[in-house]
Swiss-Prot record:
GO CC annotation, single: nucleolus
Subunit structure: Interacts with DCD53 and SKP1. Component of the SCF(CDC4) complex containing CDC53, SKP1, RBX1 and CDC4. CDC34. Interacts with CDC6 and CIC1. Interacts with SIC1; the interaction involves a SIC1 double phosphorylated motif (degron). Homodimerizes; the dimerization increases SIC1 ubiquitination in vitro.
One GO BP annotation of this record: sporulation resulting in formation of a cellular spore
Name the record gives this protein: Cell division control protein 4
Domain F-box: start-end pairs: 272-319
Gene behind this protein: CDC4
Residues passing through the membrane, by range: none
Region named Disordered: 39-80
UniProt xrefs under Pfam families: CDC4_D (PF16856), F-box-like (PF12937), WD40 (PF00400)
GO MF annotation, one: U3 snoRNA binding
Length: 779
């Protein structure tokens, strides 16, 4: 079957929609009348003929069919007239056939715009067949009727403001257009004459001067100017209903291509920006529900969207928290650091910059092809590094060589070495502002000022190795809590100042207190364990200790008393965490289990009874609220993030649990099944180390991302990371090193040698394409 041809003018033959129809009449206006008159008289025509049907008129449809068929004659533009029937007389009005509309007059003599095809009106039109035009035209302008002489040759009339509604003058054409000749260009002169090109000096005043400009042969009018004036005249003098009718006629006579262009233009400009049309608070709330990928895309949608997003403090705060770059409780601290780092930026800009930096770095962490910049620094004299702290851009390590070494994580260099202990350093805790506390096998606790590079206080009192320590703060007082192999915990107040003047006598410091009685910072001793205290954790006034006697004890350091004894493990306890937000205690043991204890409501645990110790009555709880199983060997390591509780064991496995309900979330195994010696976790990343293995996991996808970054290390002793920087204490070829990995930079590895007894560092940089070559230490 053949396809139907598409109409060239799709809207021409459709009925006028109801909302665009008009009824009744309108009073004649000078400017509109001038436009109608000019439209009729401006067309060049040598003759005019009345074509009539049996009733003396020709149907417009027949005329259009003839024009479409074509007669082979050259038909120049002509004046077309519509015959309007009245009871008493017939009046001819100029019309424009190209707009398929005409001016009609009702019984009151008022002009009315109607649709010719709908009203079955008849036309009196000029034809170019050489017949004579009527000698007289009766033109009805308003109520009055005027007779206009129509000679065989007619010149365009010059119409003044007073002539529009009262009379129409005719003139003689001196140079009539020859039949078949092309129409004159708007800028061309009449034959035999020369007309200089000059801009018109006439001023259009919304009356028949518009027609005067149209008819003018000696002036050049800007098309835009003329269009604006015509539109203004129509818009100011036509009622809205008639104006809509006229617009529809204009659109109806556009061809398919023009309609398509117009439709696209209308569609594009009718689009509505929902976000900017809403109140700012509601728009912001909508953005708060978007993920960061959508937020980044929204920044490029429009300037308004970009402004809303960029200037919103709450939005960037929400993104930082929701993407796990900062915890809700840590936001204020982050905001303070950012204000110090970017003092000239607004809060919104600081938060936005921080978020974008974190996103960029996280993508590098998650990219298995990304190789971070690696810097290797000389470690301790022994191969084993026992403890590591990474705070305030300080990386601090302790070892059995009795030394504490401090590195700068920003500049990736060794800073200084702290000496003073007479035994191995097994416990470290960074306080604030460069203050460090250490515990040693020499049974002492030392307080250090890193900025001044010296020890400020020495606390004595333990009878055996200080194996663990923590710092808690309660009512603006910071307490040092230490656990020892002598089965006790000691509590000291942390000195508020280093007490070392800038130019003091060095031999007077550190301040050494040989006995607790003479120590003004000593608070007391906590007794209750029957074996070595292996782990301690606390917050505020609550401290939890775990011992080789298989029990945990919950202490109140403000009152220096025991609160609860937690029994349930069947073997030594190696790690414990006090979850102060949920008021729970978490412990890991050699019995391969992890146990959860509810300290807010002790009746949620096992059987509860009361026991007494040397100080005060103490509740004894037999059995935990939850017991987590899955490991098959000693569980020696625990860490808690906002989302996950993570445990690591000697069976080479790492398991993740939901921090709220303790459901299983993930499980990883090192390929060599060697004991996990260290790991560190955030809500986005997990890093673990063991013998000959160092892994980085994407906790969002659950996939192993990196496994070969430190493949030249024989043993990973300790790891920690924050932001773009990961630090790892490792052993290679019987020596210890500190590795610094920068995930904001790629592919460059620095191998650095530091003289052990010097705070200055000699640097040697070697770059490799993959960063996997073994370290060569420069002597």
């Amino acid at each position: 079957m053949g396809s139907f041809p598409l109409a060239e003018f799709p809207l021409r033959d459709i009925p006028v929609p109801y909302s665009y129809r008009v009824s009744g009449g309108i009073a004649s206006s000078g400017s509109v009348t001038a436009l109608v008159t000019a439209a009729g008289t401006h067309r060049n025509s040598s003759t005019a003929k009345t074509v009539e049907t049996e009733d003396g008129e020709e149907d417009i449809d027949e005329y259009q069919r003839k024009r479409a068929a074509g007669s082979g004659e050259s038909t120049p533009e002509r004046s077309d007239f519509k015959r309007v029937k009245h009871d008493n007389h017939k009046t001819l009005h100029p019309v424009n056939l190209q707009n398929t509309g005409a001016a009609s007059v009702d019984n009151d003599g008022l002009h009315n715009l109607t649709d010719i095809s709908n009203d079955a009106e008849k036309l009196l039109m000029s034809v170019d067949d050489g017949s004579a035009a009527p000698s007289t035209l009766s033109v009805n302008m308003g109520v009055a009727s005027h007779n206009v002489a129509a000679p065989t040759t007619v010149n365009a009339a010059t119409i003044t403001g007073s002539d529009v509604s009262n009379n129409v003058n005719s003139a003689t054409i001196n140079n009539p257009m020859e039949e078949g000749a092309l129409p004159l260009s708007p800028t061309a002169s009449s034959p035999g004459t020369t007309t200089p090109l000059a801009k018109t000096t006439k001023t259009i005043n919304n009356n028949n001067n518009i027609a005067d400009l149209i008819e003018s042969k000696d002036s050049i009018i800007s098309p835009e100017y003329l269009s604006d004036e015509i539109f203004s005249a129509i818009n100011n003098n036509l009622p809205h209903a008639y104006f809509k009718n006229l617009l529809f006629r204009l659109v109806a006579n556009m061809d398919r291509s023009e309609l398509s262009d117009l439709g696209t233009l209308i569609k594009d400009n009718l689009k509505r920006d929902l976000i900017t049309s809403l109140p700012f608070e509601i728009s912001l709330k909508i953005f708060n529900y978007l993920q960061f990928e959508d937020i980044i895309n929204s920044l490029g949608v429009s300037q308004n969207w970009n402004k809303i997003i960029r200037k919103s403090t709450s939005l960037w705060k929400k993104l930082l928290i929701s993407e796990n770059f900062v915890s809700p409780k840590g936001f204020n601290s982050l905001n303070l650091k950012l204000s110090q780092k970017y003092p000239k930026l607004s809060q919104q800009d600081r938060l936005r910059l921080s978020f974008l930096e974190n996103i960029f770095i996280l993508k590098n962490w998650y990219n298995p092809k990304f190789v971070p910049q690696r810097t290797t620094l000389r470690g301790h004299m022994t191969s084993v590094i026992t403890c590591l702290q990474f705070e305030d851009n300080y990386v601090i390590t302790g070892a059995d060589d009795k030394m504490i070494r401090v590195y700068d994580s920003i500049n990736k260099k060794f800073l200084l070495q702290l000496s003073g202990h007479d035994g191995g350093v097994w416990a470290l805790k960074y306080a604030h502002g460069g203050i460090l506390v250490s515990g040693s096998t020499d049974r002492t606790v030392r307080v250090w000022d890193i900025k001044k590079g010296c020890c400020t206080h020495v606390f004595k009192g333990h009878n055996s190795t200080v194996r663990c320590l923590d710092i808690v703060e309660y009512k603006n007082i910071k307490y040092i809590v230490t656990g020892s192999r002598d089965n006790t915990l000691h509590v000291w107040k942390l000195p508020k100042e280093s007490s070392v003047p800038d130019h003091g006598e060095e031999h007077d410091y550190p301040l050494v207190f040989h006995t607790p009685e003479e120590n003004p910072y000593f608070v007391g001793v906590l007794r209750g364990h029957m074996a070595s205290v292996r782990t301690v954790s606390g917050h505020g006034n609550i401290v939890v200790s775990g011992s080789y006697d298989n029990t945990l004890i919950v202490w109140d350091v403000a009152q220096m008393k025991c609160l609860y004894i937690l029994s349930g493990h069947t073997d030594r306890i190696y790690s414990t965490i006090y979850d102060h937000e949920r008021k729970r205690c978490i412990s890991a043991s050699m019995d391969t289990t992890i146990r959860i204890w509810d300290l807010e409501n002790i009746w949620n645990n096992g059987e509860c009874s009361y026991a007494t110790n040397s100080a005060s009555p103490c509740a004894k709880i037999l059995g935990a609220m939850y017991t987590l199983q899955g490991h098959t060997a000693l569980v020696g390591l625990l860490r808690l993030s906002d989302k996950f509780l993570v445990s690591a064991a000697a069976d080479g496995s790492i398991r993740g649990w939901d921090a709220n309900d303790y459901s299983r979330k993930f499980s990883y195994h090192h390929t060599n099944l060697s004991a996990i010696t260290t790991f560190y976790v955030s809500d986005n990343i997990l890093v673990s180390g063991s013998e000959n293995q160092f892994n980085i996991y994407n906790l969002r996808s659950g996939k192993l991302v990196h496994a070969n970054i430190l493949k030249d290390a024989d043993q990973i002793w300790s790891v920690n990371f924050k932001g773009k920087t990961l630090v790892a204490a490792v052993e290679k070829d019987g020596q210890s090193f500190l590795e610094i990995l920068d995930f904001s930079k790629a592919s460059k590895i620095n191998y650095v040698s530091n003289p052990v007894n010097s705070s200055s560092s000699s640097l040697e940089s070697i770059s490799t394409s993959l960063g996997l070559t073994r370290t060569t230490i420069i002597p």
